[in-house]
Design a protein with these regions (language model features):
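Bulky hydrophobic segments
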Residues: 1-161, 166, 177-194
Length: 194
């Protein structure tokens, strides 16, 4: 009987804990919108108007949307781990030592590639300044993705959501660097045509 009660309590607390951070974030954003526009109809009308007319609004919306996808994948929708340091090295190849296929390295690589390109697209002047060079773009991409990814890994460690892994950090940074290179190439092509 004690095991059943323990299991029920554990399952109920886990069911509330898993969506807690997402619910908190969503509630905070809702309250900001509510205080700015108490009328839902007016808020929706203004949002659609901004989306149609303001390109920077669309860019930042895309960045916020993609950042939310990353956070939901890495932090907000994770199970609690008893030992977040159980696999510090992580997975470095497509197959685990027992021969099972894993796509973690590909997911981590692809997760940050668009993020960096979108981030530079939104904040090029603030991040890269007026003169965009290859090494400046690459360094800024690596530095930014390292800080963001390291923060996610540390939050996974502290909050016990997932495992802290060096391979995640490496492939996130590699994906971010490739995203920075893709942004640089697109930027140069766009400015050569002008």
């Amino acid at each position: 009987m004690a095991e059943i009660i323990k299991s029920v309590i554990s399952n109920v607390l886990t069911a509330f804990y898993q969506p807690f951070w997402f619910a908190l974030l969503l509630a905070a954003l809702f309250m900001l919108a509510y205080k700015a526009y108490p009328s839902a109809k007016d808020a929706a009308r203004r949002w659609v108007e901004w989306f149609k007319t303001d390109s920077s609004f669309r860019k930042i919306f895309l960045l916020a949307f993609y950042t939310a996808l990353i956070l939901f994948r890495t932090l907000l929708n994770r199970n609690i781990w008893a030992n977040p340091l159980s696999d510090v090295m992580g997975k470095w190849w497509l197959y685990t030592p027992d021969g099972k296929l894993t796509t973690e390295m590909i997911e981590n690589f692809l997760l940050f590639m668009p993020f960096t390109a979108i981030l530079f697209w939104c904040f090029r002047d603030k991040l890269l300044g007026g003169w965009v060079t290859f090494f400046k773009t690459l360094w800024c991409a690596v530095k930014t993705v390292f800080l963001f990814s390291f923060t996610i890994e540390m939050l996974q460690l502290v909050l016990r959501l997932g495992t802290w892994q060096l391979s995640d950090l490496f492939y996130n940074i590699l994906g971010g660097a490739v995203g920075g290179i893709i942004y640089f190439i697109a930027y140069k092509i766009k400015h050569i045509k002008k």
